[in-house]
Each structure stands twice: as C-alpha cells, then as structure tokens.
C-alpha cells in the first residue's frame, strides 16, 4: 500500500517579495531547491508561520544564490514580505521516507541541514 510521506522541507524561509498580478506561485532560489531536494514544477504545501495560512502551489526555479523566496499570483495574498514560511514536498511510497530538511535564518541562509 502506498502512503504519503514528507520528502523535503525548507523550514523558516523568509518571503522576500510578492506580486499578485503575475503568472506563477512560489519562486525558490535554485540552490535552496537543490539542497532540499525540491524540483521545479513540484507540488508543495506552504505554511505561513506569521498568519497560519496554508496553501498548496507549485515551485518556480529562482536565481541560484539569490536567497529569494517570492510569492506570485493568488498565493501572494497569503503572505507578506518578511513573513516566515515552511515549504514542504511529499512523495508516495510503500515504506517510510527520511525527509531532507534545511533550516534557514531570516536572510534565507542555511543554518542547518538534516
């Protein structure tokens, strides 16, 4: 039987920009995506720590090394610049999966990898 498991998490990312009238959803620095094991176009669950909003969207690959986490389109209405978010990706598996997690500081620099 297949279950859904957490496979990747970017913990405590800071929203750096938002733009409502834009095609897309969440843009993540390509370097951070790689470290967390998240791919462009992948479905993610985003939890806003500041306002408790939760939303599902897809990932846009951002500029490598920019440290940007940007909300676009309707998702931009669910967070503000400076809000801290948790970004999670999941997978189907018939056995438990060990999630890859990166923890960020307020400048979106990696402070811990698990």
UniProtKB/Swiss-Prot annotation:
Keywords assigned: Autocatalytic cleavage, Cytoplasm, Decarboxylase, Lyase, Pantothenate biosynthesis, Pyruvate, Schiff base, Zymogen
Cofactors, names only: pyruvate
GO molecular function, one term: aspartate 1-decarboxylase activity
One example of a Gene Ontology biological process annotation: alanine biosynthetic process
Record's comment on post-translational modification: Is synthesized initially as an inactive proenzyme, which is activated by self-cleavage at a specific serine bond to produce a beta-subunit with a hydroxyl group at its C-terminus and an alpha-subunit with a pyruvoyl group at its N-terminus.
Family: Belongs to the PanD family.
Function (record text): Catalyzes the pyruvoyl-dependent decarboxylation of aspartate to produce beta-alanine.
Subunit organization: Heterooctamer of four alpha and four beta subunits.
Protein name: Aspartate 1-decarboxylase
